[in-house]
Structure formats: structure tokens, C-alpha cells
Amino acid sequence: METNVVLAVLFWGCLLLGMPEGRGQEAEWRKGTYSDGTLRYEGYFRAGKPAGEMKRYYPDGKLQARMVYRGDTVEAVLYSRKSDCSMRGKYVVRNKQGTWEYFKNDCLLMKEEYRDQVLNGKTVRFFSTGNPAEEKDWVNGKPEGEWKLY
């Protein structure tokens, strides 16, 4: 009897962990298409809203964005049409939040800090070698302090 209870608990735990956000609510896998039938997006939805991983595609079929939805937070990786990573960061209630990184050909170009969609913190631009090219601090969207050029 104890073995059956343990197996049942493990089984249900695995099922819940396998669901997006692990809340036990039913999630539906959906795909959307452009008017020509090309895949536009694919991902899980719960109560009509994205939940868990979602991918968006350009009309030519290349990956445009990979996002992971958790409540009001979205971790996003956005790609250029060339399919190299262009930017990576987090949205909270549709506002940029925290560190955002910008790339070109897999080379880090810049890091910025956001609070509620507004620059707050340090912005660092990089040379193609990876060394800092410039640094600037921001408070509520306005530059503050020294602007360091290297």
C-alpha cells in the first residue's frame, strides 16, 4: 500500500513539473500562422494568455523570439533576421526590467540596466574585443556622473 502511495505521489509530481509554470492548470499548445500559412508562433497558453515557452517566427520562417512566460514576467531572447541573437533580457508587466544585453554576430555590444522600462544603472558599450569602450550611469532615464570613454 505504501509503495502505491509513493508511486502515485511521484507520478503526479512529475506531471505537474512537466506542465508550464507547474501549477497543475491545463495548458494548451497552440500554433498561429501568417495568412500564407507560414508558422507565426507556437507555445503554451493558459486562460488565453501565453504560459511557459513560446517562439515567434519571421514570415520567412526564421526564429524571431524565444520567450518564457511566468506570470507577469517574460524572459526574452530576440533575434535579428539573420538569426543571430540581437538582445536578451526580461520584461515585467511589459516593461524592460533588469539587465539587457545587445549582440551583433554573437559579440556583446552593450549592457544596460532598466527599472520599469527606464534606464537606471550602468550602461556599458564594448569593443569587438570584449573590452569596455564606454560606461555611463543613469538615474530615472537621465545620465548622471562621469561618462567614461576608453
Where are these regions (language model features)?
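Glycine/tyrosine- and acidic-biased, solvent-exposed loop/turn segments at the edges of beta-strands
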Residues: G18-Y150
